[in-house]
Amino acid sequence: MRLVTANVDRFDRVVVSNTGLPMYGKEPSAAFRAWQKFSQEVPVFEVGKLCNGGSQTDLGADVVAAYDAPFPDETFKAGARIFPALYPDGENDPSNIANKKAWEILHSFTKPFLCAFTDGDPVTAGGDRAFVGKVPGTAGQPHTTIVGGGHFVQEDKGEELAGVINDFMAATPK
């Protein structure tokens, strides 16, 4: 989301799925806190296995291996490992400051903005409520909940998500 708000002129429309832009003062779910703790404490961060666990379907050994491929050893996983720890846990937390600035821009973002969250992600299910009605571009859009998808919607319901995106693009030409 911060990429969008830092480059508004480069986007004609936005589709968000299984994401968020949290601010300090709103406690995350217990599932997120468990994920955050796990990410910092597990000795071996098995990216492919984690992606498989975040999906509703079994990804298969070849897909798990593809998710592991960019990370030949633990030293390559620092970014993936630290990402959950970037949750803004204080008013002056750098993530909180950056997210506040991003929300200021989103509150006046009038370009078409569609939410397509899944129902099967324990962390982000229902996350569309953070955007719909708060981002002006969400008005009148056909927001959808993709049933049966986990966090990695592209794996569980990739064709359905692609259809939602294609329909949205066709309905909102630039």
PLM regions and their residue ranges:
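Conserved hydrolase catalytic core segment
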Residues: M1-K26
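Serine-hydrolase catalytic core
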Residues: A102-F109
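Catalytic active-site module of serine/aspartate enzymes centered on a nucleophile-bearing elbow/loop
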Residues: A139-K174
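Helix-rich cap/lid subdomain of alpha/beta-hydrolase
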Residues: M23-F83, Y87, P94-I97
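Short, solvent-exposed loop/turn segments at secondary-structure junctions
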Residues: G20-P22, P72, A85, D119-V123, ...
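Conserved loop-alpha-helix segment in the C-terminal half of the alpha/beta-hydrolase fold
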Residues: F113-G149
